[in-house]
Amino acid sequence: KEKIFVHHENRILIRYTLVDAHSATTLRFRPFLAFRSVREYTHENPQANRDYQLVENGVKTCMYPGYPELFMQLNKKNEFHFDPNWYRGIEYPKEQERGYDFNEDLYVPGYFEVDIKKGESIVFSAGISEISPRRLKQVFETEAEDRTPRDSFYHCLKNSAHQFHNKQE
C-alpha cells in the first residue's frame, strides 16, 4: 500500500500492489469518510446525506451541504456495494496525548470490490473533481517521481519547504 497526495490538487492516490497470491484474489476497499474541519470530529448523525451517484469506475457523494462533492474512483472496473454504516469510536492516540478530542464516528457509504492478480497494482483516487481512471497509474507514477526522497536531513528540509509552495493562477 502506497499513498501520495497530488501536487496543487485536492486529491489523494492510494496504490495497492498484490505481491504474491496462490489463488484468485479480490480487493475489498471500504472508504471511511468524515467531511469535517481538521479539529472538529464528527459523530453519527441523521443529517449525513447517504446519496451517491455512479461515475466512471467509482462513485461521487457529498455528506453535508456546503462541502464539495467527493469523487472516489479506481483505475480498474469494479463493483460498488452500497452498504451505509457508521464506524463508531475511532480513536486518535496522538490527539489524546496532545490534550485534544480524540474520538469520532466515521461514515462508510459501502465498499468497492475489484479482482486483482499477482503483480498487479490498483490505484484508488479520492478528490473533489472527477478524473479519467485511465490516467490514475500515470499520475501516481509522475507524483512519485517528483517526490523528494526522505533519505537525508537535507532532503527532509527540502521536502518541508516544498509543502509551503502555493500555485499561482
Q: Which residue stretches match the model-derived regions?
A:
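Acidic, mature catalytic/reactive cores of soluble proteins
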Residues: 1-169
